[in-house]
Amino acid sequence: MKNAPSNRLNLSVQYACNREGLPLRADFVRWARAALVGGGEVTIRLVDADEGQSLNKEYRGKDYATNVLSFPYDTEPVVMGDLVVCPSVVSKEAAEQNKPLEAHYAHLTVHGMLHLQGWDHDNDDDAQAMEDEEREILAAMGYPDPYAV
């Protein structure tokens, strides 16, 4: 008899930058779990702008630091992948968009977790579906619509 896939989330958080006010591992676990269908093996690495820029250039061909990068490895039997989050970009965006910082971290974690599960926003229909899913997940946790700017 084949074992059923696990619903367990094994989440590691790597704090590779010195920045006050970063979310705790427990926050990332809550946000990631809310977006995850089934189980997962995920690492979230918080990086400085230099590392974020280097990774974005290497993997996406864009020479700037971005808010979150997703590196999916597998979806069966559990989701496996890495998220790279750049706190300096997240903080700047939250301030510019007049969003609570915690809500922006929650949104980007959910967004990244959906990418790890195969969601994308390569065309308008996919983007709308992904945004709707993000809104639903975030609302269930009590966060505002991240796209109502």
From Swiss-Prot:
Residue sites binding Zn(2+) per the record: 111, 115, 121
GO CC terms in record: cytoplasm
Pfam families named in the record: YbeY (PF02130)
InterPro entries found in the cross-reference section: MetalPrtase_cat_dom_sf_prd, YbeY, YbeY_CS
Compartment(s) of residence: Cytoplasm
Name of the top EC class for this enzyme: hydrolase
Keyword Lyase: no
EC number assigned by the record: 3.1.-.-
Gene Ontology molecular function, alphabetical: metalloendopeptidase activity; RNA endonuclease activity; zinc ion binding
Main localisation: cytoplasm
Cofactor note: Binds 1 zinc ion.
UniProt GO BP: rRNA processing
Tree of life domain: Bacteria
Keywords (A to Z) from UniProt: Cytoplasm, Endonuclease, Hydrolase, Metal-binding, Nuclease, Ribosome biogenesis, rRNA processing, Zinc
Keyword Magnesium: no
Family of the protein in this entry: Belongs to the endoribonuclease YbeY family.
Function noted in UniProt: Single strand-specific metallo-endoribonuclease involved in late-stage 70S ribosome quality control and in maturation of the 3' terminus of the 16S rRNA.
HAMAP family reported in the protein's UniProt record: Endoribonucl_YbeY (MF_00009)
The protein's name in its UniProt record: Endoribonuclease YbeY
